[in-house]
């Protein structure tokens, strides 16, 4: 009887391995567009790469995104002041576009419109467009401005 148990266990293990391999092969075939990345299924079976950027819909109505835009301008002003880079401050206008990416937290790529305070700046007080990247870690109640710079394709930049 002892000789039959290992054969039964071996058969079960072999079956588990075969099912796992078949399942993995089936998933790789149906994963779509190459890249071999992990995919997240959404309605209708269409997948997207986990960790990829997604557009934020209704940016102007998204209070969190608008607040992050305001935070990015305030933080930029604070950093300029601490480096003694002059008195020119930006005044937040609005976030005009945003993308969200899941990292260890949420990374927001924001396109922010802001004007120089005191309207008589070098561009006559016209809003300028800036790109900002902010990381939010809600469980730590933390927001960090990573970058803030004039948008490369902004028509108001000289």
UniProtKB/Swiss-Prot annotation:
Site (Reactive site): 51
Residue segments, region Disordered: 26-51
Composition-biased stretches (Gly residues): 29-49
InterPro entries noted in UniProt: Cystatin_dom, Cystatin_sf
SMART domains, sorted: CY
UniProt xrefs under CDD domains: CY (cd00042)
Keyword Secreted: yes
Motif Secondary area of contact per UniProt: ranges: 101-105
GO biological process: defense response
Protein's job: Specific inhibitor of cysteine proteinases. Probably involved in the regulation of endogenous processes and in defense against pests and pathogens.
Descriptive protein name: Cysteine proteinase inhibitor 4
Source organism: Oryza sativa subsp. japonica
